[in-house]
């Protein structure tokens, strides 16, 4: 195999290392542990520069995985549940933290979405 084919194979493997999640109909709510909250501006997500907020964390379950949610639309600090643009409900469980898989997915998500400007707002997010 020549270098060109190896490079294409590498690009393919990198692209499939982050995959789509179940539909909202199949998975209407999700619990995130070891979570963070990020503000995002610019890139493909908000080319107009408007802020979007995203939860990043780990989903426990039969196939636990790192997860980045679509833009948070509403958040209830009492229940620690947020509804995202997709309509999925995310519950932030336990204390904030860092998960290696979640942070890997986050870094890939940022790259895929044009490396927008990012700020970790976990400690200042209202009601968290």
Report the location of each language-model feature.
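Cysteine-centric segments in proteins
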Residues: 2-81, 88-128
């Amino acid at each position: 195999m020549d270098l060109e084919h190896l490079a294409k194979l590498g690009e393919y493997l990198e692209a499939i290392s982050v995959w789509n999640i179940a539909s909202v109909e199949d998975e209407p709510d999700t619990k995130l542990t070891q979570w963070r909250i990020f503000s995002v501006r610019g890139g493909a997500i908000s080319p107009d520069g408007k802020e979007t907020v995203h939860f990043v964390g780990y989903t426990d379950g039969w196939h636990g995985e790192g997860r980045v949610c679509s833009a948070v639309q509403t958040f209830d600090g009492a229940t620690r549940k947020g509804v995202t643009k997709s309509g999925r409900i995310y519950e932030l469980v336990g204390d904030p933290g860092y998960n290696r898989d979640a942070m890997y997915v986050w870094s890939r998500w940022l790259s895929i979405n044009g490396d927008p400007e990012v700020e970790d707002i976990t400690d200042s997010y209202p009601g968290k």
